[in-house]
Amino acid sequence: KLGEFSPTRTYRGHNKKDKKMQKK
């Protein structure tokens, strides 16, 4: 459930993966 609050500053590298998961 990281996409719920998508903390970009918490993990920038995961931010790109999180965006792809949110699109799905």
From Swiss-Prot:
Taxonomic superkingdom:
Bacteria
**GO BP field:** translation
Q: Which GO terms describe its cellular component?
A: ribonucleoprotein complex; ribosome
Family statement: Belongs to the universal ribosomal protein uS19 family.
Function as written in the Swiss-Prot or TrEMBL entry: Protein S19 forms a complex with S13 that binds strongly to the 16S ribosomal RNA.
> Which GO molecular function annotation, any one, does this entry have?
structural constituent of ribosome
Positions of region (Disordered): 1-24
Protein's name according to its UniProt entry:
Small ribosomal subunit protein uS19
Compositional bias of type Basic residues: which residue ranges?
A: 11-24
| Ribonucleoprotein recorded as keyword | yes
Which keywords, in A-to-Z order, does the entry hold? Answer: Ribonucleoprotein, Ribosomal protein, RNA-binding, rRNA-binding
